[in-house]
């Protein structure tokens, strides 16, 4: 080591690096700003069209017809709140502490904030401290805990020229190191930057509705102008009436009702899951989970409890019985600085008086797979993997491994401990085997079996030994436990090729976890990922839906879609049920909403076509006004579908939501179109007044809508019958109330119009039943 490194950087060198921007000051921010979120949810084509219609209605002072705009505002507000919450969630993510760093500059040791470090700074790190920046060891020795970053539960030995990763911790020892990377180039910074990418909202229902809105958005302006000019110039209606009638057609084409119900249903699902101790941090993830067909599990904390415990201690020599073994382990763990889960389990089991003072200690290393300690009056005690310490295989160790346990051997030597060149001594004697077990979660087997029955594929992705993971998976009832691979021994290309067919992935790095998820998504799967460590973050962010345990690392909780507050994997099916309930029920009642979209479009086309025929008596003006549609919606699209979305429905989600819903809505929409054409022509031939025609059409429109409500309520139950009675009764009560009649611009069915209504509804009911049965068969 040269003098410059011992002295550290000079103030001049520090200023030069600061001027060059080589400073450890980096904040990983989300890619989406608050303004971008607001803009994305407010300044949309859908909102712009509704706003333009609202302005037109306000301009002609048609105040009673502006009720619809409250729905638009609520939709935009819900979208903003949902995305802001997701942004806030990832903004909080931070893998680094803010503790002062001992830094050598101009030969003096000073305490600096991590963000004040520059490239080339010499820093001194001791046990228990976090590494503030990627650095190379200049002198000293340390055991580093990289579990938070890499998933490796064992400590990693770092000697001269070893690379220290930012975000990891020194478990033992002390080192003098030189900053190798700063700011965005640091390992932890790159990890945070990837994790802080705000994923776009993934809702197939909303995307389907956006497609529909996109289509209507392209035609709505020319349609609106044509309808307005037709009513104003050709039919000679007043400006207010022309605007109101034209607006009704345009509003009917925009699917705002089902968009509102979707958001409301998801919000209720969030509340229900919250009552069941499941925190939903991203509303649309409920829908996504309902569509999941590939669930990737982390072994620790998911299938197992994540709580290591000593299952058994098996003495291997008559010289040292169980009491002697316990005394040695008690002394060893009392002096040991090892903090990995296995050491903690042994320490918890063996407590008491320390019989042997410590002379020297060599911490456990994941490279060596063993640790050692020289104890006064005993010798050098070794604790580690049997295959690394013993020359021959111990049958009992193999049996324990096949049971899914971690096995350690306690051994003794009389040779002195060499810290500079640690190696296995020639006179080593095995004293005992320790079987360490991470218990299977109660109910895990039933949960896995149920998920399989629901057509959900399962994969286990773990940083542990694949043989151990396979054994644990077998005990948990995992069907494909025999299909596993050691990811530390294959390339990325090989991993991508094996991702679809392999069930268990062991020794997986954070990058490989993400790659597995990406490969599965490219294969067409909707993926969910469970995890609890920082090493899972990249995969959790990549998955369509991320689920973490509340007992997991705080960083994973901050970026997860769902957090299991009870840290119980067995809650996953309940979340699946809730998602399927929402998605299936929305698909079930969607035709009720799409009837209006279809008939509004068809009637608008007919109205425009009628103006091109050249005869004034054939010109058709859109027959409804916004307040009429709004009132009918209360009893057709409002309360009944809302109540029906709460019913249990856990069948697998069907594809092609929009296409199937449109086909189911088409017969009813055609009935409305036929009603308008027939009543207009027949009424004119019979000399009916516009009020009589408007009244009959109002009743027909409401009644055709009720046919779809009846279908949605089948098979009938007491509550569903009461729902139908409330809807039909509410519709009739408002239609017969004089004040409301005036507002709706209708009256009561007369002796001339009532029989026509009865005959038409009888025919429509028969047609509706026949078409519904035909569609059900298909």
Curated annotation (Swiss-Prot):
Listed GO MF terms: ATP binding; ATP hydrolysis activity; metal ion binding
Annotated Gene Ontology cellular component terms: plasma membrane
Extracellular side: 58-64, 230-242, 607-624, 685-689, 740-757
Cytoplasmic membrane side: 1-37, 85-209, 261-586, 646-663, 709-716, 778
Membrane protein topology class: Multi-pass membrane protein
InterPro entries: ATPase_P-typ_cyto_dom_N, ATPase_P-typ_P_site, ATPase_P-typ_TM_dom_sf, ATPase_P-typ_transduc_dom_A_sf, HAD-like_sf, HAD_sf, P_typ_ATPase, P_typ_ATPase_HD_dom
Pfam family, one: Hydrolase
EC number: 7.2.2.-
Residues the record marks as active site: 298
Subcellular location per the Swiss-Prot or TrEMBL entry: Cell membrane
Catalytic function, reaction form: ATP + H2O = ADP + phosphate + H(+)
Family of this protein: Belongs to the cation transport ATPase (P-type) (TC 3.A.3) family.
Name used for this protein in its record: Probable cation-transporting ATPase exp7
Organism: Streptococcus pneumoniae serotype 4 (strain ATCC BAA-334 / TIGR4)
